[in-house]
């Protein structure tokens, strides 16, 4: 039996037939072994070409990895040898060619969900086998999936595969097929086994839809779409299919579904009935009827360390045989242990398979090993050395999870957090030629803080300032960095962005808790905390300013040791600990798919609410009592070197009698007009002018005696107060520009009926106050 399965060790022992495919440094031929009379595919690699292009190590690695593998879903490498001119790989012949060509030329339609599930199960089984041996394929695509004579799926082309030392090892090389490459690979971030999971998601989408999810006419535009991870999901796909694709194509590799979980997903259980991988002939017979038997080969391209590597693989069906030696130049036996029989893989001696992942599923962790803490990449031939050597940023990567979109302008930069969580810094310089400020540098940072893109838009001229950041652009791969290798000349930009994110976090509630005495809010920083007592007092705790206590009149209590302050601080400390415990408990309860934050616990006691303040649903400015804030959080002085909050005590102490008089009277509407295409303008008895815009946002202009400035409330209910000497965001500035004409119209409006009993001396003169900038979320 052994003699009938023996493969030749020289090219003369094969009858070489027609060409299947040709690449830059190799050709693939159909051939027949003269000993076993079996059809095979022979890949002939030109030694001179690979030596000239520096790809000798890549060929060595391909042979080293592929020769060890034996699995029903992996194309088998039978043997390899060489002569003076060529390295020869004798491969299993896939009679029915590549899956991509079969779908386009024979099936002439996308696969059904049942067919797609059958293919998916076989691919996942093969990848689990590879991953169980810490082998990352890095180029899973329909062109690299071949069909045997019995229509079984065969994973082929290990030209980009790499052997990891451990499952959580990370590499940095940018390689793969553009339509199937993962965001972390495009961004040159450290990546590992989850990169293959992303490719499986692209594969499944392509099978069911007929085209890749991020396909465009150009490679650069395709890679840009991959980085943004934005694709259209066809509505005709079932819920199970859509759910699985979304889980496979999660932008963050930590959030992607694992291959083990794919096998348990309802999409496979529903369409394949949860049965195990089938090795019986005709596993894909439901779509094989239209197949005309053909031999196939293909040539593909891959970018590896900026070099174009022409790769191809053969296109069937046999069992393995002994692995002969190859010249040390290409396959060092000291590393692989092929110099003697006892050092060869066990399946070569006994004809048995290496343990398949299916045998190990019950003992495998459902999560990717080691992905909670990404290890810094180490130096090897696949990794890009860090330009900064041993120096690293001293701050951890920023993170914008759960932060609302916002845009903030300083003197030299415009900072934004987008709906996707991406942070965008637009650095501004005055251009004399255009007589205006122009955007000269752009820094885009991913939501997890690990991918950074820095470039100059339209160098020399810059871009005009808009209400939103410029569209995403990657001018060249040299503009893309990751957290580990960011050059130190760009560190200040990263620090600037991180402090901006920290500022927004310090104003974004994570836990809202109603205690017996007040409304408590623990911010996303987990250190910033505030309590607004029902009595009107307030306690603020921040990592920069410590604890500040305000009494019911809005005045700062300078002596925190007095009885009044002590009681407020004690209650605040108790509530702070309670909120932290709630947060920790919910962190354990939440999953990748379902977050628990932000969360509101309890509600304000009914006895402490005025009748006019009890309302449900949307904000209705006519149905509750208006109140002017008696105190405001400090104004923000934002710079790259410091973020500080300041507030003068005199702001609270001056006009205190006046404030007390105003506080004694209900703040009710006295005038109201409706302005077409703008909204409803209301004047309150305390002098506040409010504009409720039709888009759901609201601007309140507060008179100087009340503290001055404006309060801007977004459509989602998030309020920001702007005070003295600060710039306004564009959205607020546009609305403020309309205020003078609205106030003029309001002056001509008659008083409302319920306003005639209000004492006239309590109404603030209608003067246009300057509009300044202070955040008080």
Swiss-Prot record:
Catalytic residues (UniProt): 139 (proton acceptor)
Maturation and modification: Ubiquitinated by the SCF(Slimb) ubiquitin ligase complex; leading to its degradation by the proteasome during interphase and regulating centriole number and ensuring the block to centriole reduplication.
Pfam annotation, one family: Plk4_PB1
Domain Cryptic POLO box 1 (CPB1): 390-507
Transmembrane segments: none
Coarse class of the protein's main subcellular location: cytoplasm
Occurrences of domain POLO box (ranges): 669-748
Recorded family membership: Belongs to the protein kinase superfamily. Ser/Thr protein kinase family. CDC5/Polo subfamily.
Function: Serine/threonine-protein kinase that plays a central role in centriole duplication. Able to trigger procentriole formation on the surface of the mother centriole cylinder, using mother centriole as a platform, leading to the recruitment of centriole biogenesis proteins such as sas-6. When overexpressed, it is able to induce centrosome amplification through the simultaneous generation of multiple procentrioles adjoining each parental centriole during S phase.
PANTHER family, per database record: SERINE/THREONINE-PROTEIN KINASE PLK (PTHR24345), SERINE_THREONINE-PROTEIN KINASE PLK4 (PTHR24345:SF91)
Name of protein: Serine/threonine-protein kinase PLK4
Organism name: Drosophila persimilis (Fruit fly)
């Amino acid at each position: 039996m052994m003699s009938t399965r023996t493969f030749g060790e020289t090219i003369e022992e094969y009858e070489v037939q027609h060409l299947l495919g040709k690449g830059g440094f190799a050709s693939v031929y159909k051939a027949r072994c003269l000993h076993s009379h079996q059809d095979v595919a022979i890949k002939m690699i030109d030694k001179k070409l690979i030596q000239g292009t520096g790809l000798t190590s890549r060929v060595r690695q391909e042979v080293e990895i592929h020769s060890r593998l034996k699995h029903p879903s992996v194309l088998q490498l039978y043997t390899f040898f060489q002569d003076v001119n060529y390295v020869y790989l004798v491969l299993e012949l896939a009679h029915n060619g590549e899956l991509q060509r079969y779908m386009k030329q024979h099936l002439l339609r996308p696969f059904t969900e049942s067919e797609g599930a059958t293919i998916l199960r076989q691919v996942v089984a093969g990848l689990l086998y590879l991953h169980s041996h810490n082998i990352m394929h890095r180029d899973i695509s329909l062109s690299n999936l071949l069909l045997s004579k019995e229509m079984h799926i065969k994973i082929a082309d290990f030209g980009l595969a790499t052997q990891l030392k451990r499952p959580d090892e990370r590499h940095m090389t940018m390689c793969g097929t553009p339509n199937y490459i993962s965001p972390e690979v495009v961004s040159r971030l450290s990546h590992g086994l989850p990169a293959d999971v992303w490719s499986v998601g692209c594969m499944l989408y392509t099978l069911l839809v007929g085209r890749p999810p991020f396909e465009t006419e150009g490679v650069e535009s395709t890679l840009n779409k991959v980085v943004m991870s934005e694709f259209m999901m066809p509505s005709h796909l079932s819920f199970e299919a859509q759910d699985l694709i979304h889980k496979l194509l999660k932008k963050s590799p930590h959030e992607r579904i694992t291959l083990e979980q794919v096998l348990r997903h309802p999409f496979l259980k529903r369409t394949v009935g949860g049965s195990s991988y089938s090795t019986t002939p005709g596993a894909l017979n439901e779509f094989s009827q239209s197949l005309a038997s053909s031999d196939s080969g293909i040539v593909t391209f891959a970018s590896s360390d900026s070099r174009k590597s022409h790769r191809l693989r053969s296109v069937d069906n046999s069992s393995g045989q002994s692995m002969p030696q190859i010249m040390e130049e290409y396959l060092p036996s000291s590393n692989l242990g092929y110099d003697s029989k006892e050092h060869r893989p066990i399946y070569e001696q006994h004809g048995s398979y290496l343990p398949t992942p299916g045998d190990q599923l019950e003992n495998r962790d459902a999560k990717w090993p080691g992905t909670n803490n990404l290890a810094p990449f180490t130096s090897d031939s696949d990794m890009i050395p860090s330009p900064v050597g041993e120096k690293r940023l001293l701050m951890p990567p920023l993170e914008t999870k759960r932060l609302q979109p916002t845009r903030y302008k300083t003197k030299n930069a415009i900072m934004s957090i987008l709906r996707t969580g991406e942070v965008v810094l637009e650095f501004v310089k005055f251009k004399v030629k255009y007589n205006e400020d122009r955007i000269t540098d752009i820094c885009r940072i991913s939501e997890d803080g690990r991918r950074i893109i820095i470039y100059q838009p339209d160098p020399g001229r810059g871009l005009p300032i808009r209400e939103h950041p410029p569209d995403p652009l990657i001018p060249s791969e040299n503009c893309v960095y990751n957290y580990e290798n960011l050059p130190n000349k760009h560190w200040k930009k990263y620090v600037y962005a991180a402090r901006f994110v920290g500022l927004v976090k310090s104003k974004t509630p994570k836990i809202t808790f109603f205690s017996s005495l007040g409304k408590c809010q623990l911010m996303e920083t987990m250190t910033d905390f505030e309590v607004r007592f029902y009595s009107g007092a307030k306690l603020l705790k921040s990592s920069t300013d410590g604890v500040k206590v305000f009494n019911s009149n809005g005045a700062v209590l300078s002596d925190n040791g007095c009885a009044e302050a002590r009681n407020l601080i004690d209650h605040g400390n108790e509530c702070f600990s309670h909120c932290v415990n709630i947060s920790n408990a919910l962190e354990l309860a939440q999953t990748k798919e379902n977050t628990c934050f932000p969360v509101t616990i309890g509600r304000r006691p009914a006895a402490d609410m005025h009748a006019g303040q009890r309302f449900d649903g949307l904000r209705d400015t006519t149905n509750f009592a208006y109140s002017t804030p008696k105190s405001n959080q400090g104004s923000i002085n934002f710079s790259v070197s410091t973020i500080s909050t300041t507030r003068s005590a005199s702001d609270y102490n001056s006009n205190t009698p006046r404030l007390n008089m105003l506080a004694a009277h209900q703040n009710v509407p006295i005038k109201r007009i409706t302005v077409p295409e703008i909204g409803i303008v209301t004047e309150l008895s305390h002098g506040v002018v409010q504009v409720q815009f039709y888009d759901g946002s609201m601007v309140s202009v507060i008179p100087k005696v009340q503290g001055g400035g404006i309060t801007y409330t977004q459509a989602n209910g998030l309020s920001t107060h702007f005070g003295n000497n600060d710039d306004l965001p564009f959205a607020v500035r546009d609305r403020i520009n309309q205020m003078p004409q609205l106030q003029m119209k309001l002056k001509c409006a008659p008083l409302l009926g319920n306003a005639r009993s209000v004492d006239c001396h309590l109404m603030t003169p209608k003067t246009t106050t300057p509009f300044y900038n202070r955040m008080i979320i």
